[in-house]
Amino acid sequence: MKRIVILDYGLGNLRSVQKGLEHVGSSPAISGDPEEILAADGLILPGVGAFVDAMKCLDPIKGTIEEYARSGKPMLGICLGQQVLMSSSEEGKLTDGLDLISGKVLRFPKSELKVPHIGWNNIKIKQDHPLFEGIPDNSFVYFVHSFYVDTASENTLASCNYGLDFSASVVNSKGNVMGTQFHPEKSGAIGLKILKNFVDMC
């Protein structure tokens, strides 16, 4: 069986991601150990909280994550986990991300729409990629976030509109480092299919 590691770096709803992966037939490990990370067939970066805090927590294993990304093996960032993959974020103060995918994380502008963006919304698939194999365009998925990845990034896999268009999913140029702003583990059958697609990539 493919070994999937859910990265434990002090932030994130690890158990819900673990249950989602178990539902699609995987037996993921939860670990922050560099050796276990590098030995994994697939790596998931969950995340709930502030970008600055996440980067501080990731700092001791930043080099390990970068090495894993270079290996070509699949890696998936979820919610805040997607945001930390990017070049930078304006949350709090301008903070550098892991810069594994080019793009900026921005704050939703003040408008009549409530922030954070919480709930179900449809996504537009922009590129063919194994992560979205069998996922119909305009599928609904579940979001909880106050910051977004700018769709100016050519790395957008899928977009969503909440007052403005933003990147609901991103991918690096090699195709192995991916992110979803939405929570696949909370997105019903569609989300579980996306998790299954990730496992199948590993």
From Swiss-Prot:
Its EC number is 4.3.2.10, 3.5.1.2. Residues 3-202 form the Glutamine amidotransferase type-1 domain. Pfam families: GATase. Keywords: Amino-acid biosynthesis, Cytoplasm, Glutamine amidotransferase, Histidine biosynthesis, Hydrolase, Lyase. It comes from the Archaea. It catalyses: 5-[(5-phospho-1-deoxy-D-ribulos-1-ylimino)methylamino]-1-(5-phospho-beta-D-ribosyl)imidazole-4-carboxamide + L-glutamine = D-erythro-1-(imidazol-4-yl)glycerol 3-phosphate + 5-amino-1-(5-phospho-beta-D-ribosyl)imidazole-4-carboxamide + L-glutamate + H(+); L-glutamine + H2O = L-glutamate + NH4(+). GO terms for biological process: L-histidine biosynthetic process. It is found in: Cytoplasm. Heterodimer of HisH and HisF. IGPS catalyzes the conversion of PRFAR and glutamine to IGP, AICAR and glutamate. The HisH subunit catalyzes the hydrolysis of glutamine to glutamate and ammonia as part of the synthesis of IGP and AICAR. The resulting ammonia molecule is channeled to the active site of HisF. This is Imidazole glycerol phosphate synthase subunit HisH. It comes from Methanosarcina barkeri (strain Fusaro / DSM 804). The lineage of its organism: Archaea, Methanobacteriati, Methanobacteriota, Stenosarchaea group, Methanomicrobia. The gene is hisH.
